[in-house]
């Protein structure tokens, strides 16, 4: 059985982590909201994951941010370099929530509206969804390259399908959304760390 982290420790101080997958998804939204200042985003994520204890412990903000990134990236270490190749996104947790919820119920008999679940388990299960589920089918349609279709009627059919499931364009939308969550948060961390250095944290 997998052992998922529930606490973090810095200099002998123990912090309880809010491990609920809904909180992690909220952190993802905040990290991708360019209308919020970097320092406000970082503090919001510290508060969501570590509560008042983390928010009040300003001397350890930098360390808490690094732990937050590692937690949100499901334990993967932060690397100095990453693949910054931009890809067209094919999923958005907020816009696709209905597809995600339906897919979890059909594949795992899990009702996400009622289930309490650790973020890491949610992420692992979402990665394990089969090609048959509605979310996977929608993502396939979004990714499908219609340029390979020669028949005009068939091409028109695919164009309509793509329009039906297309993600809505938003101000805060990032072209790298499709990348693994750890890559997204690694990028964000670099801004937070630079801000923390300026604040001499």
Residue ranges and their predicted role:
Residues 1-14, 21-24, 32-36, 43-201:
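Charged interaction scaffolds used for protein-protein
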């Amino acid at each position: 059985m997998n052992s998922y982290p529930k606490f973090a420790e810095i200099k002998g101080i123990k912090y309880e982590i809010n491990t609920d997958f809904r909180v992690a998804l909220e952190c993802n939204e905040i990290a991708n909201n360019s209308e919020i200042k970097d320092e406000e985003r970082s503090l919001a994520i510290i508060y969501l994951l570590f509560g008042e204890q983390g928010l009040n412990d300003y001397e350890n903000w930098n360390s808490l941010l690094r732990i937050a990134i590692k937690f949100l990236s499901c334990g993967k270490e932060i690397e100095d370099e990453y693949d910054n190749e931009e890809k067209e996104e094919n999923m958005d947790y907020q816009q696709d929530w209905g597809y995600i919820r339906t897919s979890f119920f059909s594949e795992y008999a899990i009702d996400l509206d009622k289930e309490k679940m650790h973020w890491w388990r949610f992420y692992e299960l979402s990665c394990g969804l089969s090609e048959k589920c509605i979310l996977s089918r929608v993502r396939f349609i979004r990714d499908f390259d219609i340029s390979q279709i020669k028949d005009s009627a068939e091409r028109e059919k695919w164009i309509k399908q793509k329009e039906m499931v297309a993600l809505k364009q938003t101000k805060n939308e990032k072209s790298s959304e499709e990348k693994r969550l750890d890559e997204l948060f690694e990028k964000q961390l670099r801004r937070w760390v630079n801000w923390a250095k300026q604040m001499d944290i």
